[in-house]
From Swiss-Prot:
InterPro entries cross-referenced by the UniProt entry: AAA+_ATPase, P-loop_NTPase, Signal_recog_particl_SRP54_hlx, SR_rcpt_FtsY, SRP/SRP_N, SRP54_GTPase_dom, SRP54_N_sf
Membrane topology of the entry: Peripheral membrane protein
Gene label: ftsY
Protein name in the entry: Signal recognition particle receptor FtsY
The protein's role, per its UniProt record: Involved in targeting and insertion of nascent membrane proteins into the cytoplasmic membrane. Acts as a receptor for the complex formed by the signal recognition particle (SRP) and the ribosome-nascent chain (RNC). Interaction with SRP-RNC leads to the transfer of the RNC complex to the Sec translocase for insertion into the membrane, the hydrolysis of GTP by both Ffh and FtsY, and the dissociation of the SRP-FtsY complex into the individual components.
Location relative to the cell: Cell membrane; Cytoplasm
Enzyme class of the recorded protein, top EC level: hydrolase
Length: 378
């Protein structure tokens, strides 16, 4: 760092702290999904059985409900275990290296310089990194903190808080059709993600329709049609080279007339620096609104985590054009650049709906900030 930065950024080193406060660094589990109370469920069942004339269907309903809760919890736990395995490279590149900084070290300028370096190398980004470190320094001054281990847990809490703000699951409303517009640059796994979403929502009992608006790529149309046939999901498509807005117009009208629950629109991958292609997305939105003024109800950007800080510029341009309502981060399995998730969350505060850790449908899961932190940090 430059001398000017040291004098200003770390001026806390020479200041005298008059008041000491105790800092509580215990981490509260904020994930309500872990708070399922099975005891309450079986207490109701026991009370019902003790009745003089219990109804068998009522007991069966409670039994089924208990099994559903257990199945949902097992699915959640399995995804968490796979997430931890998938983020091993990011953990090694970010979590482990940061942890080493705090081992048996005093809190001084050198510690913060090393922390800054590791965070930048992990693709957390300069703005987010500086904001986190600046806030840590303020806490050190305020609390007269001397213990580096406590400072480490305080860092984890700050990084958790950044992610918690964007942990907002996508809720499909009863509006028919609920239109999801999926956008992104080439190679992010957009079409594959569309298929995963379709299969996931179908398993939830919703009727699904897909629109193959990636008309620039014949293989993309064929891929979506094949995935639709495999899952018995209708796909609205036209020949390669057709106007994508025309495909989407037909799809929205068809979904509306057939009372489809969810319509997912796969658009062509487009470079964020090709302004005419970004303008085409605006045209697509206008076409959708001609049929349903409230649609699209969700505008999802697919982000490839392997692209690191390049995703920041992509998100900025797509968000400016469409006012994005959600993000899906793909290819977290094996990437060393998982730190970009913090940068995305901090700079844009757009809800992260899902994260992808593999090719299978079950490898697309709801984003959980607590699990993400636990998967990366010791």
């Amino acid at each position: 760092m430059k001398d000017s930065k040291k004098n200003g950024f770390f001026s806390w080193l020479s200041s005298k702290i008059k008041k000491k406060k105790t800092i509580d660094i215990r981490q509260n589990n904020t994930d309500k999904n872990h708070d399922i109370n099975h005891e309450d469920l079986y207490t109701k069942k026991d009370l019902l059985i003790k009745q003089d004339n219990p109804k068998k269907d009522e007991i069966d309903t409670l039994n089924d409900h208990g099994k559903d809760i257990e199945k949902a919890q097992n699915t959640k736990n399995n995804f968490f275990l796979r997430l931890k395995k998938s983020l091993k490279t990011t953990k090694k590149n970010l979590g482990d290296k940061i942890y080493q900084i705090f081992l048996s070290k005093k809190i001084d300028e050198v510690l913060f310089e090393e922390l800054e370096e590791k965070m930048l190398l992990a693709d957390i980004g300069i703005n987010t990194t500086n904001r986190i470190i600046s806030n840590l320094i303020k806490d050190v001054n305020r609390e007269d903190l001397k213990n580096s281990e406590k400072l480490y847990f305080l860092l984890k809490r700050k990084m958790f808080n950044i992610l918690k703000k964007v942990e907002i699951p996508l809720e499909i409303s009863s509006h028919s059709p609920f239109v999801i517009l999926v956008v992104g640059v080439n190679g992010t796994g957009k079409t594959t993600t569309v298929a995963k979403l379709a299969e996931k929502y179908k398993l939830e009992g919703k009727s699904i329709m897909l629109a193959a608006a990636d008309t620039f790529r014949a293989a993309g149309i064929e891929q979506l049609q094949t995935l639709g046939k495999l899952n018995n999901i209708p796909v609205i498509a036209q020949r390669s080279g057709s106007d994508p807005a025309a495909v989407i117009f037909d799809a929205v009208k068809s979904a509306k007339s057939k009372k489809i629950d969810v319509l997912i629109i796969d658009t062509a991958g487009r470079l964020h620096n090709k302004l005419h292609l970004i303008e085409e997305l605006k045209k697509i939105v206008r076409v959708i609104k001609k049929i349903d003024i409230s649609a699209p109800h969700e505008k999802l950007l697919i982000i490839d985590s392997c692209n690191g800080q390049n995703t920041i510029q992509q998100t900025e341009i797509f968000h400016k054009a469409l006012n994005l309502t959600g993000i899906i981060i793909t290819k977290l399995d094996g990437t060393a650049k998982g730190g970009v998730v913090f940068s995305l969350a901090d700079q844009f505060q757009i809800p992260i709906r899902y994260i992808g850790i593999g090719e299978k449908m079950q490898d697309l899961g709801h984003f959980n900030s607590q699990e993400f932190i636990e998967s990366i940090f010791t």
